[in-house]
Amino acid sequence: MTLPSGVERHDFGGETSLATQGQPVYGERTDGDWRRWDPHRSKLGAMLAHGMDTGLGGGETVLYLGAAAGTTVSHVADFGGPTYAVEFAPRPVRELLDAAESRRNLFPLLKDARKPESYAHVVEPVDVVVQDVATRGQARVATLNKQFLTDDGRLLAAIKARSEDVTADPDAVFDSVRAELSAEYELLETARLDPYHEDHLGIVARPRKD
């Protein structure tokens, strides 16, 4: 797998890890201008660490759903183009705003990813939608936001089984999510994100042509 331009492997205290160039956000280790992209704290980082073919090349316009305090989306903005970061909870948005201060291409939006009509007037067509909202109905969130993707764009989703049903077998949850997504997306690759994130599934997909 080829890493996106702007993402490299660096040594951090004897441990090789993915890294991007930018101001530190969450206390991560640094190597000069490079900061460690910790896959234990980032589902997209885990997808890249697993060698999934995300289709990212660098410079893409991105819609990031479930940005939280900016841990992952700050890395995305380090190597991406315009990056729209949707987060519903006010408290983490304050930290997200801090991450955006040194990233002129990162645009925090205090919005609900389940209501894309509330930010449709702001977000331009994007090359990538990252679905990182850990709530029931994760596939529906990805489907609702398909409208922003270009025809050859990519969905990069991290599905948390316990957010869908804490009592169900994770494999059954993942089967259900894959089936729901398949109505709107062509699934290109899926992989469990262990050992970085237990009971999570990484998904790479593209919009189905009408």
Curated annotation (Swiss-Prot):
Span list, region Disordered: 1-34
GO biological process: box C/D sno(s)RNA 3'-end processing; tRNA processing
Gene Ontology MF annotations: histone H2AQ104 methyltransferase activity; RNA binding; rRNA methyltransferase activity
EC number(s) reported in the record: 2.1.1.-
List of residues binding S-adenosyl-L-methionine: 71-72, 87-88, 112-113, 132-135
SMART domains from the UniProt entry: Fibrillarin
Domain of life: Archaea
The entry's keywords: Methyltransferase, RNA-binding, rRNA processing, Transferase, tRNA processing
Pfam families with a match to the protein in the record: Fibrillarin
Family membership: Belongs to the methyltransferase superfamily. Fibrillarin family.
Subunit structure and binding partners: Interacts with nop5. Component of box C/D small ribonucleoprotein (sRNP) particles that contain rpl7ae, FlpA and nop5, plus a guide RNA.
Protein function: Involved in pre-rRNA and tRNA processing. Utilizes the methyl donor S-adenosyl-L-methionine to catalyze the site-specific 2'-hydroxyl methylation of ribose moieties in rRNA and tRNA. Site specificity is provided by a guide RNA that base pairs with the substrate. Methylation occurs at a characteristic distance from the sequence involved in base pairing with the guide RNA.
Protein name: Fibrillarin-like rRNA/tRNA 2'-O-methyltransferase
Species annotation: Haloarcula marismortui (strain ATCC 43049 / DSM 3752 / JCM 8966 / VKM B-1809) (Halobacterium marismortui)
Gene field: flpA
